[in-house]
Design a protein with these regions (language model features):
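Flexible helix-coil transition and linker loops at the boundaries of alpha-helical arrays
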Residues: 97-98, 112-126, 158-168, 202-205
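Structural motif corresponding to the intra-repeat A-B loop/turn of tetratricopeptide repeats
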Residues: 140, 144-147, 184, 223
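N-terminal cysteine/histidine-rich coordination modules
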Residues: 1-84
């Protein structure tokens, strides 16, 4: 609080649309409010006030093109045509730049996903959008849809790995692939990815190495619990 004025969590930034070049305002959460009180093992964070993830996607009110700050900065002619034919021609002008609730955030992410798929956006962008949608369903308590989109994000993350390979800075990608496998109950696949993080000498990310070891240990406990439950069910 400065001079008796209470600082609001949201502020506006100007964005130039990558599709139609229209300049518009979209909301962001101030850094001082980005303090998660809890974070899941796949980096899904929880906040007491505004959730910054609700505002990652910016939506052009003029044409409906939705993207993130990491998306393509300017579409080429082919991408513009693809977008208009499949998305833009049906857009009804409206402003999504203000405060967002969970449903608004979900709508913005799904629109961004559609736009990304239509224009052939990079796999890393698509994977991140899919993963964020899974988080939104987790906030909502919709486990079926959460797992559905975790599965989609897993496929995309693996495609990123296959196309780009892995370097010393990609421990987080390998860890995420392993952790999503674990969350989907695919324990053996998860172990294979966690082991890459732990055993690859090129990887120097101590936090991801430690996290991979912890989740590997958790899998062993989960498998043991499953076996004990099966034995009890038979007796």
């Amino acid at each position: 609080m400065a001079n008796g004025v209470k600082l609001e969590p949201l502020y506006s930034i100007k964005v130039v649309c990558a599709q139609c070049e229209h300049e518009y305002l979209t909301s962001r959460v101030r850094p001082s409010f980005k303090k998660a009180y809890r974070t899941d093992t796949d980096f899904c964070a929880y906040y007491k006030t505004e959730n910054p993830d609700f505002y990652v996607v910016r939506v052009c009110p003029e044409c409906g093109f939705a993207s993130t700050e990491n998306s393509t900065l300017k579409l080429n002619e082919r991408q513009i045509t693809l977008f208009y034919d499949q998305v833009g021609c049906r857009w009804e002008k409206r402003d999504m730049g203000g405060p967002r609730n969970l449903e608004d955030a979900l709508e913005s992410y799904k629109l961004a996903l559609l736009c990304a798929q239509v224009i052939g956006e990079r796999d890393r962008i698509v994977a991140s959008l899919l993963h964020h949608i899974a988080w939104l369903y987790r906030y909502q308590g919709n486990e079926e849809q959460e797992k559905r989109f975790l599965g989609y994000s897993l496929e995309s993350y693996i495609r990123v790995f296959e196309l780009e390979g892995v370097g010393a800075n990609d421990a987080r990608l390998l860890y995420l692939i392993g952790e999503i496998h674990r969350r989907l109950g695919q324990f053996q696949e998860a172990i294979q990815w966690f082991s890459r993080v732990v055993q690859d000498e090129k990887i120097m990310d101590a936090a991801m190495i430690r996290a991979s070891r912890e989740q590997w240990k958790l899998i062993a406990e989960q498998i043991r619990e499953q076996k004990n439950a099966a034995i009890q069910a038979e007796s």
